[in-house]
């Protein structure tokens, strides 16, 4: 089943634009959104297995760029990740396929 992952980041103000550009460069298949002082990355995967395959690479990338981020809290760390199963996609997307 398809999954959708949304990860929230809070770049330090002095790194905001640099972080957005780095994320866009490393994630051409993702939606990259900005809202106030946060950056949100959203991507779809065809299965949980595909999601798991990319996790190590994503964590390595995050480790290399962690210095640019503010911590949300000691418990949450530098990201707020959410993953869910896609139960329905908008008709305009499914009609294109």
Where are these regions (language model features)?
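Conserved aromatic
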Residues: 10, 45-46
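Short, solvent-exposed coil/turn elements at secondary-structure transition points
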Residues: 9, 36, 85-88
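Intrinsic disorder/low-complexity segments, especially N-terminal tails and targeting/processing regions
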Residues: 42-44, 95
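Active-site-flanking beta-strand signature of metal-NTP-handling nucleotidyl enzymes
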Residues: 3-10, 40
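Short, surface-exposed ligand-recognition loops at beta-strand->loop->(often short) alpha-helix junctions
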Residues: 7-20
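Short, low-order "capping/linker" segments at domain edges
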Residues: 49, 78-97
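An amphipathic, aromatic/His-enriched active-site/gating alpha helix that lines ligand/cofactor pockets
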Residues: 24-35, 46-82
């Amino acid at each position: 089943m398809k999954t959708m992952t949304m990860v929230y980041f809070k770049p330090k103000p002095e790194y905001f634009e640099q972080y957005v550009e780095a994320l866009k460069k490393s994630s051409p298949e993702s939606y990259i959104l900005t809202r106030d002082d946060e950056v949100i990355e959203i991507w779809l995967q065809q299965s949980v297995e595909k999601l798991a395959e990319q996790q190590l690479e994503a964590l390595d990338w995050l480790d290399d760029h962690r210095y640019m981020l503010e911590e949300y809290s000691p418990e949450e760390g530098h990201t707020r990740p959410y993953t869910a199963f896609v139960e329905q996609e908008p008709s305009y997307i499914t009609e294109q396929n």
